[in-house]
């Protein structure tokens, strides 16, 4: 199982995408929006397909709050008319998709806690892997010897100290789904989308149901479906 922290460039991109979606919800009760973000080396590129017109100044402020003083390239295009009509008289499944929910394992919980503990001390780009008894910690801007004292059996920064962040790496939306969803990864990403998108709502529903029943959950839907797993999609 691999886990990255909130300062990993891919997660920074996810956070920016989520912030843009939040702006849409401030403007409309049920906006339709899909956001893609590419960030790195001083620039943040954003494309938003949306029913809402957003102020670029607000988008830029969100980027600066999350990622620092970057140059923001923001492109906004209207939602496709056929897709808009699909939701005209009620919330329906916004895309075809397959979805899987898997119970969280003790390994997942352990590594997630390790990631939180390290990030609380070193709030910088980091990636961590747990494979049985093998623990690999790659943490930027950290005192390697300090981490080795806390985790004496871990492989810490195998190539030595490193800086990380968007000055040395790029980040893109939905590129760390394994970190987000562990064994529940399927075809669609969670980030940068409104709640009518099945990649958000049905993925989360399947995950939560798997935790509730302690068994895998497999679902699928077609664009336009108004029920999933026997329940109204609008729920």
Q: What residue spans do the PLM features occupy?
A:
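A domain-level signal for the structural core that forms small-molecule/cofactor-binding pockets
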Residues: 1-235
């Amino acid at each position: 199982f691999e886990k990255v922290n909130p300062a990993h460039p891919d997660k920074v991109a996810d956070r920016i995408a989520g912030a843009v979606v939040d702006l849409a919800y401030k403007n409309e009760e049920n906006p339709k929006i899909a956001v893609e973000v590419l960030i790195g080396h001083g620039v943040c590129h954003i494309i938003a397909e949306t029913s809402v017109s957003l102020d670029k100044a607000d988008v830029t402020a969100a980027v600066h709050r999350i990622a620092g003083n970057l140059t923001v390239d923001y492109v906004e295009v209207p939602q496709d008319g056929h897709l808009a009509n699909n939701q005209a008289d009620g919330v329906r499944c916004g895309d075809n998709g397959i979805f899987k929910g898997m119970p969280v394992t003790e390994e997942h919980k352990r590594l997630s806690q390790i990631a939180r503990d390290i990030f609380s001390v070193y709030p910088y780009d980091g990636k961590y892997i747990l494979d049985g008894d093998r623990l690999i910690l790659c943490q930027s801007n950290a005192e390697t010897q300090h981490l080795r004292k806390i985790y004496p059996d871990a492989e810490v920064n195998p190539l030595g100290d490193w800086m990380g962040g968007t000055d040395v790496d790029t980040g893109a939306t939905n590129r760390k789904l394994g970190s987000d969803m562990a064994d529940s990864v399927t075809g669609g990403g969670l980030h940068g989308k409104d709640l009518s998108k099945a990649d958000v709502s049905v993925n989360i529903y399947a995950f939560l149901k798997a935790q509730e029943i302690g068994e895998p959950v497999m679902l699928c839907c077609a664009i336009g479906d108004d029920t999933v797993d026997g329940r109204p999609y609008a729920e």
